[in-house]
Amino acid sequence: MIGSLTGIIEEIYITYIILNVGNVGYIVHVSQRVLQTCKIGNNIKLYIETHVNRDNLTQLYGFLDKQEQDYMRMLITINGINYKTAMSILSKLSPEQIFSAVVSNNKNAFRGNGIGEKLAGRITTELQYKISKMPIEETLIIKEDDSLAALISLGYDKLKAFNAIQEIKSDFPNANIQEIIRKALQKLSQ
């Protein structure tokens, strides 16, 4: 297994790059978001997910950060999602957007590129459970929002706390953290 590769980008294609690591060119499939950051000749470090397909061919999937890799791993555990479909989701949505779509039960965010209504519903349902079981520091939002960390430390459910905070932020966009926590506590205790 390969954990990560650091090398020079030699070639860029529609869904993958060729990464030169020690004079060996690796074909690494990446999301469109990663492709946008790639320039030929640049040095890059990618976290790697290795997959052996039906034809016994090894395929490498690269990610700029571990969070995107974790979301890929979660997506491929869902029945009906393969690596190609997961990469198309990650090309369309950032991990933060996936998290947001899941906690707000926004099935439409996942539709398109071969994903119909049933599969989109399965994605939101199954990821809600998986996201709620992730360690707090991996939920992405915690880094930006101390109010969520405070509510979780008080024993509130991560998804319910997130939804309450999002609602308060939309109603009171200029509220500081203390006000958000106070209003969220009121909302969650109803």
From Swiss-Prot:
It comes from Ehrlichia canis (strain Jake). GO terms for cellular component: cytoplasm; Holliday junction helicase complex; Holliday junction resolvase complex. It is found in: Cytoplasm. SUPFAM superfamilies: DNA helicase RuvA subunit, C-terminal domain (SSF46929), Nucleic acid-binding proteins (SSF50249), RuvA domain 2-like (SSF47781). One of its GO terms (molecular function) is ATP binding. Keywords: Cytoplasm, DNA damage, DNA recombination, DNA repair, DNA-binding. Residues 143-190 are annotated as: Domain III. Disulfide bonds: none annotated. InterPro entries: DNA_helicase_Holl-junc_RuvA_I, NA-bd_OB-fold, RuvA, RuvA_2-like, RuvA_C, RuvA_C_sf. The RuvA-RuvB-RuvC complex processes Holliday junction (HJ) DNA during genetic recombination and DNA repair, while the RuvA-RuvB complex plays an important role in the rescue of blocked DNA replication forks via replication fork reversal (RFR). RuvA specifically binds to HJ cruciform DNA, conferring on it an open structure. The RuvB hexamer acts as an ATP-dependent pump, pulling dsDNA into and through the RuvAB complex. HJ branch migration allows RuvC to scan DNA until it finds its consensus sequence, where it cleaves and resolves the cruciform DNA. Its main location: cytoplasm. This is Holliday junction branch migration complex subunit RuvA. GO terms for biological process: DNA recombination; DNA repair. The gene is ruvA. Has three domains with a flexible linker between the domains II and III and assumes an 'L' shape. Domain III is highly mobile and contacts RuvB. Pfam families: HHH_5, RuvA_C, RuvA_N. It comes from the Bacteria. Homotetramer. Forms an RuvA(8)-RuvB(12)-Holliday junction (HJ) complex. HJ DNA is sandwiched between 2 RuvA tetramers; dsDNA enters through RuvA and exits via RuvB. An RuvB hexamer assembles on each DNA strand where it exits the tetramer. Each RuvB hexamer is contacted by two RuvA subunits (via domain III) on 2 adjacent RuvB subunits; this complex drives branch migration. In the full resolvosome a probable DNA-RuvA(4)-RuvB(12)-RuvC(2) complex forms which resolves the HJ. Residues 65-142 are annotated as: Domain II. Residues 143 are annotated as: Flexible linker. Gene3D superfamilies: 5' to 3' exonuclease, C-terminal subdomain (1.10.150.20), DNA helicase RuvA subunit, C-terminal domain (1.10.8.10), Nucleic acid-binding proteins (2.40.50.140). CDD domains: UBA_RuvA_C. Residues 1-64 are annotated as: Domain I. Belongs to the RuvA family.
